[in-house]
Amino acid sequence: MQYRLLKRLRTLALTPLIITLAMGCSQAGQVVGASEPELPLPQNFQLHFNHRDAVRYRHPLNGDWRNGDNLEKQLIKAINAAKEEVLIAVQELTLPEISRALIRVKRRGVNVRVVLENNYSSPWSWQHPSDLTPRARQRQSQLQQLADTNRDERLTPDERLAGDAIALLMQNGVAMLDDTADGSRGSGLMHHKFVVVDRSLVITGSANFTSSGMHGDVGPSRSRGNVNHLLSIRSPDLAALFRQEFNRM
């Protein structure tokens, strides 16, 4: 009798633990322990990190799920919403989907202007490898791999154009300058990375508008690109300051 009572008490004591473990096992991918709560942002601010662990998106180069905010998607969303004006000042732009978004809104009548660093203002598909520095040849080779959508290691004329963000802008008449347009030798390194939409929204941060700056390099799926962020701020006063800087260049 006493043995049976002790056995039953032991079973009852273990039951909550068993239930807890079972519930935990039924929730796939749940991390044990509480995660750090995200700090609230001021009104009209949005912050995105391409290596953030709290969210995931599909890597555009290979379709795999990866951690982080899709910075390219955030830019395209803001561009698509433009009604009057989009100003972009960025050191390097090689993502064709951003160019296509700019072309779409331009066709709707939106005023689109782009300023680039002079070393990155020419279409890579127009350049001959023998005219390039070793570093520029390596960059061109990487962009060719990104443009080779069927991965047959042979670029067609259509693939070259579709994969060249600068050539797309030029072909579609998007107003574009580099930092030597005023007749100077340039700034040495025009390192701006900002977008102003409709004189009210500013998007700025650390990321160049490139695959390595936002998603990762072509090749190994483990590549998640440089660690970068974008900050979106809706403020006409701040937008006026960034427009002033844009017009100065």
Annotate each language-model stretch with its function.
Residues 2-13:
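Bacterial N-terminal signal peptides that target proteins for export
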Residues 13-22:
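Bacterial N-terminal signal peptides
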Residues 22-23, 205:
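Hydrophobic alpha-helical membrane context
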Residues 26-27:
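Bacterial signal peptide processing site
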Residues 31-81, 92-249:
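HKD-type phospholipase D/PLD-like phosphodiesterase module
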